[in-house]
Amino acid sequence: MKLEMICTGEEVLAGQIVDTNAAWFANTLIERGVECQRRITVGDRLEDLVAVFKERSTEADVIMVNGGLGPTSDDLSTEAMALALGVPLVENKEWRSKLEAWFAKNARVMAESNLKQALLPQGAIMIDNPVGTACGFAIKLNQAWLFFTPGVPFEFKRMVKEQFIPFIEEHFPLSEPVSVKKLLTLGHGESALADKLEVIPLPKGVTLGYRSYMPYIEIKLFARGQLAIDSLATIETEVKKILGHSVVAEDITTLDQEIHNSLVNSGFSLSVAESCTGGLIASGLVAFAGSSAYLHQGLVTYSNEAKVKVLGVNPQTLDDYGAVSIATVEEMAKGARGILDSDYALATSGIAGPDGGSDEKPVGTVAIALATKYGVYSQMLKLPSRSRALVRSLGTAIAYDMLRRELLGEAVIVDYSSFSRFSK
């Protein structure tokens, strides 16, 4: 099967918005053994859309078209497809009824322009959109099936998962099995990882890839064919042996997801006191439904006064060691845990930059503590300081990893190779 994607919209073409749908789509499909072989971005011009639909439908077997299904005058994908086919637009009564019901349920008046979203090219198969007002549709042109989906990410992703993937699995079954293993790493750059892992011989059918998204690097082992799949466990073991503690999770996207799952399953509670990370630790967890079951509180105690009055940090500790110190974050973590008697508490304090560093504590210095019922674990690291955002995201990730290791009964303080640790 030859799969392609056409993304529409002037704002995408002009770079005014980042097309995250295309990256997600390609990644989702490759994990199922299907490669997106071409991606084209087209602006909101009717003649350009018609031309690209006609051209690519003679080459591809399946084309995912994303965007241009809204109610406004620059949403032209449906009209362009009708012109490419040489057929009229006809009203889909089922979708019109759903539109009317949706607006009534939400106590809103449906604009006349929304009726445009019930018009489909004659002969099209309507694709349900359970979370939006723009239905999708599928129709064949030349040799290709074209699937039209809205550009709103959560609508697009749900339609892909629930309708597009089942379609291709039914009509274009894979000729051989595939398997994917993902390892999430922390503390190495992409080139450094590649240098370390190039010594591993990869059997036929196995590929090793990297995906960077701050502050992580994801290693992806992809196997096509049963013999290749059978070798994955051995290769995974070798990768973990080489990288050691830099591998922080498996088959998930971020550590906050891992922490969320662990705390929900364990029943333990957490409080957070943040200075340099400014709420990132708590925010990452609150992004997941159900976090109220374990997250007692998230405090951003940025000033020394807040550290003293809210968390009970001893003013003498701040005078003797400074806000960015192991002594201070230990007292912050103890104070945060004690307020609501949480099982665990995380605390951070650091110098995110670009100013504020010194010879003793340069920009990128971050102190992190984890308080438990039995004691406190703490460390102060020198993190890469290319940007303020990087320092904060790395500090957040390391705090998560300390808690993750504690929950697993592993050593909490470990060597991440590329991060240097202060002795005090």
Swiss-Prot record:
Highest taxon above the source species: Bacteria
Listed InterPro entries: CinA, CinA-like_C, CinA_C, Competence-induced_CinA, MoaB/Mog-like_dom_sf, MoaB/Mog_dom
Similarity field: Belongs to the CinA family.
Protein known as: CinA-like protein
Organism: Shewanella woodyi (strain ATCC 51908 / MS32)
